[in-house]
Amino acid sequence: MKLTPREKDKLLIFTAALLAERRRARGLKLNYPETVAFITAALMEAARDGRTVAEVMHYGTTLLTRDDVMEGVPEMIPDIQVEATFPDGTKLVTVHHPIP
């Protein structure tokens, strides 16, 4: 199977997000890479599901709370930018302060 660098990146994000999801389900607090992967994958899937850019941006602020992540992680992530594939093409989505 031949994958482009972008496809490899998407698979890596998905794998890290799946690990983060499992750890969160066990009650563990997510670290920085897990948090970024979790939010990024959710944004990419929301775009693929057909939500608008505005809906995806808002959705990104509802995924995790400070109780879900390790101390200091929210301050390390002032924003997340994702090139997500929407039904009408690829667009850049920016979520400011993803962990309120």
Swiss-Prot record:
<dbReference type="GO" id="GO:0009039">
    <property type="term" value="F:urease activity"/>
</dbReference>
<protein>
    <recommendedName>
        <fullName>Urease subunit gamma</fullName>
        <ecNumber>3.5.1.5</ecNumber>
    </recommendedName>
</protein>
<dbReference type="InterPro" id="IPR036463">
    <property type="entry name" value="Urease_gamma_sf"/>
</dbReference>
<dbReference type="Pfam" id="PF00547">
    <property type="entry name" value="Urease_gamma"/>
</dbReference>
<keyword id="KW-0378">Hydrolase</keyword>
<dbReference type="InterPro" id="IPR002026">
    <property type="entry name" value="Urease_gamma/gamma-beta_su"/>
</dbReference>
<comment type="pathway">
    <text>Nitrogen metabolism; urea degradation; CO(2) and NH(3) from urea (urease route): step 1/1.</text>
</comment>
<dbReference type="InterPro" id="IPR050069">
    <property type="entry name" value="Urease_subunit"/>
</dbReference>
<dbReference type="InterPro" id="IPR012010">
    <property type="entry name" value="Urease_gamma"/>
</dbReference>
<keyword id="KW-0963">Cytoplasm</keyword>
<comment type="subunit">
    <text>Heterotrimer of UreA (gamma), UreB (beta) and UreC (alpha) subunits. Three heterotrimers associate to form the active enzyme.</text>
</comment>
<dbReference type="GO" id="GO:0016151">
    <property type="term" value="F:nickel cation binding"/>
</dbReference>
<dbReference type="GO" id="GO:0043419">
    <property type="term" value="P:urea catabolic process"/>
</dbReference>
<comment type="similarity">
    <text>Belongs to the urease gamma subunit family.</text>
</comment>
<dbReference type="GO" id="GO:0005737">
    <property type="term" value="C:cytoplasm"/>
</dbReference>
